[in-house]
């Protein structure tokens, strides 16, 4: 097996804000990756990821809608990420959680992120959990939303 196969990284949530920036970094640094969208991810594609040595799980929501809730997206898809890693023989998973996550949280968002972290911790995989605060950059949700509210004279 060649070195290039061992250096490929799987990414879920690659079209989101963090995912787009991560892909840009990988492209600039000639790092090989396989993108998995939320739709493809739900169909489980272990064969597609079999050449990956690591999986970065970025799929998540920060607000619930009538179509998506925290449990389904943040927790159940974390379980699928672990399952896909095991089926694909990927030993390392990286999970983006959130600053403020704890077992004592009262927020449904933070509770879902805590539960997803527990999925990673109890997976048997080598895991890394990041707990970023607001991530700000070009086209990020927070800055874009604030700019929109300023233009509408809401703030």
Q: Where do the PLM segments sit?
A:
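N-terminal Rossmann NAD(P)H-binding glycine-rich loop of SDR-like oxidoreductase domains
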Residues: 2-29
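Structural motif
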Residues: 8, 53-54, 92
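Conserved beta-strand positions in the Rossmann-like core of class I SAM-dependent methyltransferases
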Residues: 10, 34, 128
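Conserved glycine-rich Rossmann-like NAD(P)H-binding loop of the short-chain dehydrogenase/reductase
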Residues: 31-39
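NAD(P)H-binding glycine-rich loop region in Rossmannoid oxidoreductase-like domains
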Residues: 40-88, 98-104
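Conserved Rossmann-fold NAD(P)-dependent oxidoreductase catalytic core, especially the SDR/UDP-sugar
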Residues: 73-134
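NAD(P)-dependent short-chain dehydrogenase/reductase
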Residues: 133-155
């Amino acid at each position: 097996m060649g070195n290039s196969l061992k250096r490929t990284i799987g990414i879920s949530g690659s079209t989101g804000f963090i995912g787009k920036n991560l892909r840009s970094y990988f492209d600039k640094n000639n790092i090989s990756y396989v993108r998995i969208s939320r739709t493809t991810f739900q169909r489980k594609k272990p064969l597609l990821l079999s050449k990956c040595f690591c999986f970065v799980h970025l799929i998540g929501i920060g607000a619930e809608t009538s179509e998506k809730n925290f449990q389904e997206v943040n927790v159940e898809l974390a379980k699928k990420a672990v399952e896909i890693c095991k089926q694909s023989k990927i030993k390392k998973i990286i999970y983006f959680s959130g600053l403020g996550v704890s077992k004592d949280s009262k927020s449904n968002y933070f509770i879902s992120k805590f539960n997803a972290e527990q999925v990673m911790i109890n997976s048997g995989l080598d895991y890394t959990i990041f707990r970023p605060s607001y991530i700000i950059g070009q086209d990020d949700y927070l800055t874009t939303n604030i700019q929109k509210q300023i233009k509408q004279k809401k703030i």
